[in-house]
């Protein structure tokens, strides 16, 4: 039996809506990473982007376990000497709650050129509404 390899013309993408309300950050991010990579499909091919578009709503209502709300810090660097910037989880939640889910999912993708293309299929919104109604997205029930 030959190994199946998906072709670009055979890719069928769906739009899915995920509600992040009262979901644990890491557990939700793993499921989203699986969806945007396409690993939930039987036609999964590691070298092809066969995943679905994922719209995450209610990012401001995500929760973290333990004491991460007080201890978690996000780092970025300006590439200048002494340019390390730190942002606490609480500050990030108040200013840009959508970035919390974005960074969690991005950290679960492989570090290669394909992942930079895959992460563009993730759309995160802090509130209940999103501008992708014309794609008629399906509601995805989060496991767990």
From Swiss-Prot:
Tell me which GO cellular component terms the UniProt record holds.
cytosolic large ribosomal subunit
Which InterPro entries does this entry report, sorted A to Z? Ribosomal_uL13, Ribosomal_uL13_bac-type, Ribosomal_uL13_CS, Ribosomal_uL13_sf
Give GO terms for biological process: negative regulation of translation; translation
Which GO-annotated molecular functions does the record name? mRNA binding; structural constituent of ribosome
**UniProt keyword list:** Ribonucleoprotein, Ribosomal protein
User: Could you tell me which Pfam families the record lists for this protein?
Assistant: Ribosomal_L13
Functionally, this protein is described as follows: This protein is one of the early assembly proteins of the 50S ribosomal subunit, although it is not seen to bind rRNA by itself. It is important during the early stages of 50S assembly.
Tell me its family: Belongs to the universal ribosomal protein uL13 family.
Q: How does it assemble?
A: Part of the 50S ribosomal subunit.
This protein is called Large ribosomal subunit protein uL13
* Lineage of origin: Bacteria, Bacillati, Chloroflexota, Chloroflexia, Herpetosiphonales
| Gene name for this UniProt entry | rplM
